[in-house]
Amino acid sequence: MYDRAPRWLDLANRGSTEEHVGPGTYQVPFPKQQATGCYAPFLSLSSKKDAYVVSSDPGKAVPGPAHYNVSQAQYKIKGGRTLQNREKRFKKLISDGPGPASYDCPYLGTLCIRIRQKICRKPAVSRSLDIPSIPSSGKSHGYHLNEDDTIMRRTPPSSDKTMGPAYYNPQFDYPKASLKYKGVNFGIATGRQELLKYSGPGPGHYDIIQKRKLRYENINIKRDQEHYCYSYVPRLYEEIALQEEKKGVPGPGKYNIKSQFDHIKSMSTIVDASSLLFFPETERFEPIKSSTPAPGTYNETRTAFKVPKKRSGLFSPFGQRAARFTEDYKAHELPGPGFYDISTNIVKAQVKKPHLKKKMKTGFGSSVPRALFAVQEKAFAGPGPSDYQVVRGIHDELPNLMNKYAAFLSREERTTPVQEMSLPAPGCYDVQKSYDMSQVQHNYMPPRSSVAKQRHSSFLSAAPRCLGKISDGPGPATYNPILMKSGAIISFVKAPRRFEEFQDKFSPGPTTYELSPFFRHSLLKRTYNVTLPCSASLNREHAGHAVQKTRQKYQRERFKHPN
């Protein structure tokens, strides 16, 4: 409602600076924030313009109430617009202090000698007017400016010739409060949002029924690539897949086409020479095998597992054909990566029939292959003669001569049998489920039998299983058990004793005492709340019987002698 913008009047008080000016020579005046009061609206007690801008005519220098244009602020409709950031992003900072170009400093090294002259700081004489913008009553007729710059208030005229308020005709077509827009921001819009129309084909321009054309597809050229007007740039994941496909396809110089004049080496070297006529023992239908060798096919010649040249059995000494560094033959029981046939999903038969192989002459008359079933012949992973231990002692049993795979007719087994263990296999456990039940959720398995259901609550109790030694309670020797003697004749009906012996610490119950019939009938007929004296001893009970007898005797004598 009030325009409280401060007005700075310190520009008139500034003067010139001295010749030599440094950072600590001048002080930049900062305007003081005065407390604003509400007693004068529109800052009417402050000056309207700066003091040094004074016109010769006081009427032009100080505007009156009619000089303000209020219609621009009144008829400006606020609202109805979206929030727009109309403020500048980078503001231009203007300092109130003097800048670097305001000083005239001589350059160093010159012969310019200037006389220090102190510049007069006296400001120019100017007339200052301090007239409130809204005059109060009695001061609305203006002021008179004298020659000595003094201000005198004008007196009101004796008669007023102006028209009164009844002669004015203010035209208020509509109130200014109705000009304030109070709706939504898009309700003031006069235009209508139009849909964008594209110049594409309509629904009837398409040809749904397409004619089938016979296309000849080339492997190296993609189909329908001619209608692409842009180059095909694969994405990252597509480029990785394309590179992997290129690795599997060999290049132009990678093929080795065999000619019909090339000499083909024989692949079967272990077959006997007598069986080479017309190949009678060759397989009729050979399995489809991949020409790619398995990972364990090749032997590295640079390592210590290099196989020496074969010698005949007559010239090979003991242990000459054995491997120098033996491996663990237990680790080769399972087939390797190259032993599977993907087309038939079975393991390749690496061990052929013994009668198809050429009998090799070896020392000590042993014709058993050294390698295991799942290991190739040239691997030499099986144990040698030096790996066996001779069992000393005389054995009653004969050697197992029927075992054709026993090396050197040894009674020791080549492969130790796997003992059947009662422990389950590693894959039988569910580690995640057991961890969650024991550490996270603490859930117990439900009982699986009727007996377990009865005892299930005992395992869930919080009481300790083994109680400690209780020293406060009585011991076994404290009690005095009464031993009942078993009689020959069993009496089903037993009359209770009239006078029983009780212990000293015995407290009588409600049925311990018995009243006489005389007192019993009198209590039932005459009284309802009677507290009987409790007798803890048997003497008091006997005394009650004696009193009862004396009263009965006294009543009999009274009937006999009424006077």
Curated annotation (Swiss-Prot):
<dbReference type="InterPro" id="IPR010736">
    <property type="entry name" value="SHIPPO-rpt"/>
</dbReference>
<feature type="repeat" description="STPGR 1">
    <location>
        <begin position="21"/>
        <end position="34"/>
    </location>
</feature>
<feature type="repeat" description="STPGR 8">
    <location>
        <begin position="423"/>
        <end position="438"/>
    </location>
</feature>
<feature type="repeat" description="STPGR 9">
    <location>
        <begin position="473"/>
        <end position="483"/>
    </location>
</feature>
<dbReference type="InterPro" id="IPR051291">
    <property type="entry name" value="CIMAP"/>
</dbReference>
<feature type="repeat" description="STPGR 7">
    <location>
        <begin position="334"/>
        <end position="353"/>
    </location>
</feature>
<feature type="repeat" description="STPGR 5">
    <location>
        <begin position="250"/>
        <end position="263"/>
    </location>
</feature>
<dbReference type="Pfam" id="PF07004">
    <property type="entry name" value="SHIPPO-rpt"/>
</dbReference>
<keyword id="KW-0677">Repeat</keyword>
<feature type="repeat" description="STPGR 6">
    <location>
        <begin position="292"/>
        <end position="321"/>
    </location>
</feature>
<feature type="repeat" description="STPGR 2">
    <location>
        <begin position="63"/>
        <end position="73"/>
    </location>
</feature>
<feature type="region of interest" description="Disordered">
    <location>
        <begin position="131"/>
        <end position="163"/>
    </location>
</feature>
<protein>
    <recommendedName>
        <fullName>Sperm-tail PG-rich repeat-containing protein 2</fullName>
    </recommendedName>
</protein>
<feature type="repeat" description="STPGR 10">
    <location>
        <begin position="507"/>
        <end position="518"/>
    </location>
</feature>
<feature type="repeat" description="STPGR 3">
    <location>
        <begin position="97"/>
        <end position="107"/>
    </location>
</feature>
<feature type="repeat" description="STPGR 4">
    <location>
        <begin position="200"/>
        <end position="219"/>
    </location>
</feature>
